[in-house]
Amino acid sequence: MRVLGVDPGLTRRGIGVVEGVAGRPLTMIGVGVVRTPADADLGHRLVAVEQGIEQWLDEHRPEFVAVERVFSQHNVRTVMGTAQASAVAILCASRRGIPVALHTPSEVKAAVTGSGRADKAQVGAMVTRLLRLAAPPKPADAADALALAICHIWRAPAQNRLQQAVALHTAQGPRRPHKLHPSKGRPA
């Protein structure tokens, strides 16, 4: 499975591609950061975000895209920029028919480090170890993008099984309750 991880941001977004399957060693295919000037017009910045993501999609041909789910922050301006960059990444992937998964920061940290409260240094150290890199990717946004891809590779099989079970249950329709034996409380 090849996954493009996107750590969204309007000024700087980490992008990383990881290939592998759960339970086997993973391989980093590429990692980087797409930047936009903070003083540029919003429309131009979003176009630059789109062009950067499209370039990564063209070059690396991922099967899935994993994007960090935007969470509430105190700085509304930061949340808005992150949400806008996230939407562009989702749009680019969806336009190509590539499935998109959203993962929360704590979900990614827990998957990669074992703790949903891990700091950036701990995430970077585990990404370095898991991908057998010589040094942690810099800046931290790049390491976060790789962590998103790793999280998706590890969690996708379980999520797929759960979705299949729900789909099967839904397709079968509602089940009739068993009639209980009046004196024993067991099915008759």
Curated annotation (Swiss-Prot):
The keyword Disulfide bond does not apply. It is an enzyme of class 3 (hydrolase). Keywords: Cytoplasm, DNA damage, DNA recombination, DNA repair, DNA-binding, Endonuclease, Hydrolase, Magnesium, Metal-binding, Nuclease. It comes from the Bacteria. Mg(2+) 1 binds at D7, D141. The active site is at D7, E68, D141. One of its GO terms (cellular component) is cytoplasm. CDD domains: RuvC. Its main location: cytoplasm. Mg(2+) 2 binds at E68. Its EC number is 3.1.21.10. PROSITE patterns: RUVC (PS01321). Its cofactor is Mg(2+). One of its GO terms (biological process) is DNA recombination. One of its GO terms (molecular function) is magnesium ion binding. It is found in: Cytoplasm. It catalyses: Endonucleolytic cleavage at a junction such as a reciprocal single-stranded crossover between two homologous DNA duplexes (Holliday junction). The RuvA-RuvB-RuvC complex processes Holliday junction (HJ) DNA during genetic recombination and DNA repair. Endonuclease that resolves HJ intermediates. Cleaves cruciform DNA by making single-stranded nicks across the HJ at symmetrical positions within the homologous arms, yielding a 5'-phosphate and a 3'-hydroxyl group; requires a central core of homology in the junction. The consensus cleavage sequence is 5'-(A/T)TT(C/G)-3'. Cleavage occurs on the 3'-side of the TT dinucleotide at the point of strand exchange. Homodimer which binds Holliday junction (HJ) DNA. The HJ becomes 2-fold symmetrical on binding to RuvC with unstacked arms; it has a different conformation from HJ DNA in complex with RuvA. In the full resolvosome a probable DNA-RuvA(4)-RuvB(12)-RuvC(2) complex forms which resolves the HJ. Belongs to the RuvC family. This is Crossover junction endodeoxyribonuclease RuvC. It comes from Streptomyces coelicolor (strain ATCC BAA-471 / A3(2) / M145). The lineage of its organism: Bacteria, Bacillati, Actinomycetota, Actinomycetes, Kitasatosporales. The gene is ruvC.
